[in-house]
Amino acid sequence: MQRITITLDDDLLETLDSLSQRRGYNNRSEAIRDILRSALAQEATQQHGTQGFAVLSYVYEHEKRDLASRIVSTQHHHHDLSVATLHVHINHDDCLEIAVLKGDMGDVQHFADDVIAQRGVRHGHLQCLPKED
């Protein structure tokens, strides 16, 4: 491990210290390492051809015209990416789905875009993790 020196604006340093405290980091170095790892992982997952894992979460109205069947159709069309799906009934109208995906990150992003773009899908979020060798 190497020791480096960085220069930060006062406002940015305040934000870093606040983040470190909220997340329970013992020091700034740990927080900066995690932030950097997260940024590098995100960049790696945006490269087509990169293999990895992802979690796609979204809320949808199950009574919306044919929405549930369109989502299922999209899932079946990309069956090779799906590892598991959790379905939660939030209330009478809304469902939360959490899909664990595995494969080429470009294909995973395409699948997520297909689902999130469906009319009636809200709060779509894709969290990607590159496969570590």
Swiss-Prot record:
Its cofactor is Ni(2+). One of its GO terms (molecular function) is sequence-specific DNA binding. One of its GO terms (biological process) is response to nickel cation. InterPro entries: Acetolactate_synth/TF_NikR_C, ACT-like_dom_sf, Arc_rbn_hlx_hlx, CopG, CopG/NikR_regulator, Ni_resp_reg_NikR, Nickel_NikR_proteobac, Ribbon_hlx_hlx. The keyword ATP-binding does not apply. Keywords: DNA-binding, Metal-binding, Nickel, Repressor, Transcription, Transcription regulation. CDD domains: RHH_NikR_HicB-like. Homotetramer. Transcriptional repressor of the nikABCDE operon. Is active in the presence of excessive concentrations of intracellular nickel. This is Nickel-responsive regulator. It comes from Escherichia coli (strain SMS-3-5 / SECEC). The gene is nikR.
